[in-house]
Amino acid sequence: MKFSKLSLTLALILTQALLVVCGKINEDFMENGLESHALHDEIRKPIDTEKADAERGVLDCVVNTLGCSSDKDCCGMTPSCTLGICAPSVGGIVGGLLGRAL
């Protein structure tokens, strides 16, 4: 298998560039620790209370409703109540198998 001189040169240049980028990231991390990390930025963001309240409401609905008697009991998460279970409408082969199982 023969490689041209140009392809070997390009591979070498790209490898060196990758090592330089990784070195810069590592250097930044060693200097600043987690303070420069994206996870640290997300942790410091204020909590959106409206979103948290909506999620808490859905969670309460799911916990309080073990079975369903109508589509309203599914807390708006799945479209239909089938045989006492909130079942999503899935198309294709998987939907057919789920439909027969329920």
UniProtKB/Swiss-Prot annotation:
Database matches in InterPro entries: Omega_atracotoxin_CS2, Toxin_23
Annotated family: Belongs to the neurotoxin 15 family. 02 (omega-actx) subfamily.
Cystine bridges: 61-75, 68-81, 74-86
Keyword field: Amidation, Calcium channel impairing toxin, Disulfide bond, Ion channel impairing toxin, Knottin, Neurotoxin, Secreted, Signal, Toxin, Voltage-gated calcium channel impairing toxin
Positions carrying Leucine amide: 98
Protein name: Omega-hexatoxin-Hi2a
Signal peptide residue numbers: 1-23
Entry annotated with the keyword Transmembrane helix: no
Top-level taxonomic group: Eukaryota
Tissue: Expressed by the venom gland.
Keyword Zinc assigned: no
Organism per entry: Hadronyche infensa
Notes on the domains: The presence of a 'disulfide through disulfide knot' structurally defines this protein as a knottin.
